[in-house]
């Protein structure tokens, strides 16, 4: 089994609805998103995925969230923009963009602080 990972960072604000504590107020993070792709074999070029293709798909999503209030971006207008929900959203959106190439994310991990992360993967 092969595994490749791509990381990217973005700055964004959010607040948590119905939360009791300081995170209920608008605040920001320098987030890191980490995308891992797994495959049982490499292609004829010797790659699981071209990092350029993965980077382009990730950049499309980063453009939507960077320097924004996440609560103003669907689905986070209705769903709390927690690290868990962000990880699931990135996973689903990357899968939608990469599936036509036969590429599917294995796991997406979101870091909202250097020591706090959440991950999403399909079983």
What are these regions (language model features)?
Residues 1-123:
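Charge-rich, low-complexity N-terminal segments
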């Amino acid at each position: 089994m092969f595994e490749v990972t791509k990381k990217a960072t973005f700055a964004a604000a959010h607040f948590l609805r119905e939360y009791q504590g300081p995170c209920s107020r608008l605040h920001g993070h320098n987030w890191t998103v980490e995308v891992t792709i797994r495959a049982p074999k490499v292609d004829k070029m010797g790659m699981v995925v071209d990092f350029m293709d993965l980077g382009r798909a990730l950049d499309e999503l980063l453009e939507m969230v960077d320097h924004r209030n996440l609560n103003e971006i669907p689905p986070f207008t209705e769903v709390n923009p927690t690290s868990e929900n962000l990880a699931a959203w990135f996973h689903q959106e990357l899968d939608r963009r990469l599936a036509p190439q036969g590429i599917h994310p294995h796991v997406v991990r979101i870091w909202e602080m250097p020591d706090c992360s959440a991950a999403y993967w399909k079983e």
